[in-house]
């Protein structure tokens, strides 16, 4: 079994060694320009067109949970990968736990009003504030995939009312499920904290705009953990300035790194991190990939395959 690996920043030698230990019958090599030798599987992140074009691969593994970048490249260069070759994304590989940590810590930060206390501290004001109740702090999750399910599970332990909005109905215990555009308003009207975990598709680009934000309760919060292109940043800033939103926590942006001139840097109600909410953890990724390749070789059912038509 031949496996080729490409990632512009990862330590290729480590990955090659780890994969060969996990799959003793495989020969793994780092792909370099000009390498046209046969391969059965490819592990990639932002691969050049020529790496995959013309290859008769059994499967391609994308070294991350998001596949929007490679799907966009495939649309622009259909010769890059035959449509019959399955494409897999990393379903969890430690990302679920990281998303849980991030979401829970931020929801609790707002629930306990630590943002307000930081503002008071900056003014040297000693002023206890009224507490929020859990009943008035409903959390709504947009996107009900693997990571959305993990986040809902972790928040459930804290007793917050939970709801999710997705393409298909979910039957998660203790979580109200809303489906499609026709139920979006009802989902938003009672959502105090909006967590975005949607996939990046043509239907979801720019979805968090003034029209959507206006349907949230006054004083709501937005936590974006998905993709920067989901948010119309000017509309978000306008909602913060008007008081419609009380705060926003952003891990992703329409342009990364975020330009120095962006007003998001200086807005007092915006907190941010540099796209680190959930990163690929190599050991967990190796375990998932080696297990999935073994299942594919045996003809067993697998999970994590990308639906190219849906975009995730």
From Swiss-Prot:
CDD domains: GDH_like_2. It is an enzyme of class 1 (oxidoreductase). Catalyzes the NADPH-dependent reduction of glyoxylate and hydroxypyruvate into glycolate and glycerate, respectively. It comes from the Bacteria. It catalyses: glycolate + NADP(+) = glyoxylate + NADPH + H(+); (R)-glycerate + NAD(+) = 3-hydroxypyruvate + NADH + H(+); (R)-glycerate + NADP(+) = 3-hydroxypyruvate + NADPH + H(+). The active site is at residues 227, 275. It is found in: Cytoplasm. One of its GO terms (cellular component) is cytoplasm. Its main location: cytoplasm. GO terms for molecular function: glyoxylate reductase (NADPH) activity; hydroxypyruvate reductase (NADH) activity; hydroxypyruvate reductase (NADPH) activity; NAD binding. This is Glyoxylate/hydroxypyruvate reductase A. InterPro entries: D-isomer_DH_NAD-bd, GhrA_Enterobacterales, NAD(P)-bd_dom_sf. Its EC number is 1.1.1.79, 1.1.1.81.
């Amino acid at each position: 079994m031949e496996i080729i690996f490409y990632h512009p920043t990862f330590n290729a030698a480590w990955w090659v060694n780890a994969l060969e230990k996990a799959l003793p019958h495989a020969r793994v090599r780092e792909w370099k320009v000009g390498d046209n030798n046969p391969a059965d599987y490819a592990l990639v992140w932002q691969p050049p067109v020529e790496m995959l074009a013309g290859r008769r691969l059994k499967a391609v593994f994308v070294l991350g949970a998001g596949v929007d970048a490679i799907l966009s490249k495939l649309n622009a260069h259909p010769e890059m990968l035959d449509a019959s070759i399955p494409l897999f994304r990393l379903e969890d590989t430690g990302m679920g736990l990281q998303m849980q940590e991030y979401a829970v810590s931020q929801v609790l930060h707002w629930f306990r009003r630590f943002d307000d206390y930081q503002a008071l501290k900056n003014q040297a004001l000693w002023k206890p504030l009224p507490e929020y109740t859990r009943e008035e702090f409903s959390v709504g999750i947009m996107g009900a995939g693997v990571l959305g399910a993990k986040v809902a599970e972790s928040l459930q332990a804290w007793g917050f009312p939970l709801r999710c909005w997705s393409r298909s109905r979910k039957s998660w215990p203790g979580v109200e499920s809303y489906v499609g555009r026709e139920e979006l308003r009802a989902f938003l009207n009672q959502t105090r904290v909006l967590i975005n975990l949607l996939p990046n598709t043509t239907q979801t680009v720019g979805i968090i705009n003034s029209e959507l934000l206006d349907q949230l309760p006054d004083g709501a919060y937005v936590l974006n953990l998905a993709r920067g292109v989901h948010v119309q940043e000017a509309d978000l800033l306008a909602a913060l300035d008007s008081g419609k939103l009380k705060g926003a926590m952003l891990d992703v942006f329409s342009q990364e790194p975020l330009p120095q001139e962006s007003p998001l840097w200086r807005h007092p109600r915006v907190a941010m991190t540099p796209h680190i909410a959930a990163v690929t953890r190599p050991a967990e990724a190796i375990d998932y990939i080696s297990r999935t390749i073994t299942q594919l070789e045996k003809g067993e059912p697998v999970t994590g395959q990308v639906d190219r038509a849906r975009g995730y």
